[in-house]
Curated annotation (Swiss-Prot):
Molecular-function annotations in GO: nuclease activity
GO biological process: rRNA 5'-end processing
EC code: 3.1.-.-
Record bears the keyword Glycoprotein: no
Protein name, per record: Putative pre-16S rRNA nuclease
Record keywords: Cytoplasm, Hydrolase, Nuclease, Ribosome biogenesis
Enzyme class, first EC level, given as a word: hydrolase
SUPFAM superfamilies in UniProt: Ribonuclease H-like (SSF53098)
Intracellular or extracellular location(s): Cytoplasm
Purpose: Could be a nuclease involved in processing of the 5'-end of pre-16S rRNA.
Pfam families membership: RuvX (PF03652)
Species per Swiss-Prot/TrEMBL record: Bartonella henselae (strain ATCC 49882 / DSM 28221 / CCUG 30454 / Houston 1)
Similarity comment: family membership: Belongs to the YqgF nuclease family.
């Protein structure tokens, strides 16, 4: 497994593969996947965190089932752009995943993604109880959509 830059995503995808997005929290992991055209992100389940090995095995099953070729993972930087404990935990998580998968990861600045996801759910008039269960997958979809938009822009500039 490698850590790649956003501009390298397309060379790592095989035909038919999609991109996954992850929002890593202390208690849950939000999951989203792209469509086959790599245009739209779609929220999936929220994984309740357990031991790392259990989380890793569950994620790998999801990635295999969805035919994921690249994973975008939110990197929770501080507002000033510096790395704090949560960003370090995310980097450690990715390093630990090396034992479980060859799928490359891309770190994506996730500042304000949870706030944006919550606003989106509020605008859709989702109840407080449902928002609590959907916020992490909505944040993962928001992170993934930002990356998909960037990939699309890069492809149009280069292509």
């Amino acid at each position: 497994m490698a850590i790649i830059n956003i501009n390298e995503v397309m060379i790592h995808l095989l035909p038919g593969q999609i991109i996954a997005g992850l929002d890593l929290g202390t208690k849950t992991i939000g999951i989203a996947v792209s469509d086959r055209g790599l245009i739209f992100s779609n929220p999936r389940s929220v994984l309740q965190r357990q031991k790392f090995t259990v989380d890793a095995q569950t994620l790998i099953k999801i990635f295999d089932h969805e035919n994921v070729g690249v994973i975008i993972i939110g990197l929770p930087l501080n507002m000033n752009g510096s790395s704090g404990p949560r960003a370090q935990a995310t980097r450690t998580f990715v390093r630990n995943m090396e034992a479980y998968t060859e799928i490359p990861f891309v770190f994506w600045d996730e500042r304000l993604s949870t706030i944006a996801a919550e606003r989106s759910l509020l605008e859709m008039d989702v109840s407080r109880a449902k928002r609590a269960t959907r916020i992490d997958s909505a944040a993962a979809a928001f992170i993934l959509q930002g990356a998909l938009n960037r990939i699309h822009n890069l492809h149009h500039i280069e292509g």
